[in-house]
Amino acid sequence: MADLGKIDRDFFETHVRPRLGAERDDVRLGPTPGVDFGLLDIGDRAVAIATDPVSILPPLGFERAGRFALDVVLADVAVSGLPPSHLAISFSLPPSMTDDDFAAVWEGVHAEAQDLGVSVVTGHTARYEGCSFPWVGGATALAVGDAADVIRPDGARPGDDVLVTNGPAVETTGLLTTLFPEQIDLDAETLATAQARLDEASCVRDAMTAAAAGPVTAMHDATEGGLHGAFVEMATSAGVGFEIDRDRVPIRPGVEATCDALGIDPWTATASGSLVLTVDPDGTEAVLSALDERGASAARVGRVTDGEGVTVDDEAIEAPSVDAAWAAYSDLS
């Protein structure tokens, strides 16, 4: 297991996959490395389900932190092509957190859930000794819809186009410059530009827009491991290859300056909010047009091929063993 971040594929295959409880016929897609959600068949309906830790970052302001935390959770089911619909959430709060602080967090969660049509159906909230920010709980999101509308995470097919929104290190850039503005060597204008990237660190609405616009075959939120990690995870899960042209990938303002200042590789740094999609070429323009109308920065960056592995500018890449942002966060904290 890695010292920081999610477990790797080898650890999962050795310790987790052999012990998944009872086998049930209604589990259509169970736990799989690099796959954002599980899938249940309930009668004639499909249920996408995903669980994530809840991270509350007080320097963001508690209401904004609540919205940010919820978006991270909902993204994992939004990439199923089904709109997020239900939420179970648990808070294990530090004793130092005041009632007013929690009320602000909850207002952020409520407002974002209401805007996205998500209903909170159950949960648990308490203060406990030993709990501390930012990791203060966990949440499970569900998306319920027609089975025919599900976009499987392993659905990429040879001949599909590969699309990317936002590009590398959007979350890393926005988060680190917001949390540690005085410790990063950027001028005021560049710092403000970089901090604005945090508002783009959610792919929920982009995923819903793309799914409604055209024949999307797979979607993935580029979280830990960044874009390189996301490319490898998608290709591996589908048993296909990706050929990527780096120059076509959009790069948002402030990203390169921030990553240069921190000495990190933007392509392997966490990029929540950057959506990787594979699309039937007949629908690529429709998907790009819909994303553009929503104000998203998106581009066709490559294609899906027969075979295995990912190449970027004709050079083979592997999934990063450690997210590039972790060391920077540790150094700045």
For the regions a protein language model found, what residue spans apply to each?
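Helix N-cap motif at beta-to-alpha junctions
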Residues: 279-284
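Extreme N-terminal cap/leader segments of soluble proteins
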Residues: 1-59, 110-113, 117-118, 329-333
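Small-aliphatic-rich amphipathic alpha-helix that forms the alpha element of a beta-alpha
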Residues: 62-87, 107-115, 203-209, 229-233
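Active-site-proximal betaalpha loop/short-helix elements
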Residues: 96, 196-271
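Short, acidic (Asp/Glu-rich) active-site segment that either coordinates a divalent metal cofactor
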Residues: 152-208
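Acidic, Ser/Thr/Pro-rich beta/coil linker or hinge segments at domain junctions
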Residues: 3, 291-333
